[in-house]
Amino acid sequence: MTTPEPQAAFKRVMLKISGEALMGDQGFGLHPPTVERVAREVQSVHALGVEICMVIGGGNIFRGLQGSAQGMERTTADYMGMLATVMNALAMQSALEGLGIHTRVISAITMNEVAEPYIRRRAVRHLEKKRVCIFAAGTGNPYFTTDTAATLRANEMSCEAIFKGTKVDGVYDKDPAKFADAKRYDTVTYDDVLAKRLGVMDASAIALARDNNLPIIVFSLDEPGGFRGILAGEGTYTRVQD
């Protein structure tokens, strides 16, 4: 007799991860074993029947702000960063489909040969069919981060929460890598995140989540089974919500 899957806490979620989460220890680019490990985390949540949206940053390949700081025109640098997110999305799509999970890459910048254009109703239909939707190219506009893009798409897709996968198991009052006495919050309000500059997401993303009462769950992507554990009512994390 097989053990039934636990009931998931959410029906539809947005998973936001940085591009750096896919580069492993190599310091740049994509590390295929790391991409596959993250894909398996997504697979374990997909098995619970959860509808999954994803947004992946592009910082492992190119950061628009860094390019701008080095003299490149900001708009051009941001577009380059958006293209980097498409590369990461395609890598994740390949890994997920290798695990048998139907996946769609949906780009805010039209590139029909490699990704679908963003059409909200079509994306919702993909989710209803249990396809993972990876939203790429940010919002399609410069000056907006992938955190803001993830929050925007999460609202448009009627996600019940954003899961922000990081290197630490929640939000701390100070950097736990530098301060042994750093304390983790179980819950924290949007306004406290902004006022204390806790670095969960950029201010625009936090404000957009707050204005739409969209919870943000901050957890460690490096913890095996952490994503699934939270959805099954376990694990360590911080919940950002009023």
Curated annotation (Swiss-Prot):
BP-aspect Gene Ontology terms: 'de novo' CTP biosynthetic process; UDP biosynthetic process
Means of activity regulation: Allosterically activated by GTP. Inhibited by UTP.
Annotated metabolic or biological route of this protein: Pyrimidine metabolism; CTP biosynthesis via de novo pathway; UDP from UMP (UMPK route): step 1/1
E.C. code: 2.7.4.22
Keywords: Allosteric enzyme, ATP-binding, Cytoplasm, Kinase, Nucleotide-binding, Pyrimidine biosynthesis, Transferase
Source organism superkingdom: Bacteria
Subcellular location field: Cytoplasm
InterPro entries per record: AceGlu_kinase-like_sf (IPR036393), Asp/Glu/Uridylate_kinase (IPR001048), Uridylate_kinase (IPR011817), Uridylate_kinase_bac (IPR015963)
Catalytic activity: UMP + ATP = UDP + ADP
One Pfam family in the UniProt entry: AA_kinase
Region (Involved in allosteric activation by GTP) residue spans: 24-29
Subunit-level organization: Homohexamer.
NCBIfam families according to UniProt: pyrH_bact
Name assigned to this protein: Uridylate kinase
Lineage, broadest ranks: Bacteria, Pseudomonadati, Pseudomonadota, Alphaproteobacteria, Rhodobacterales
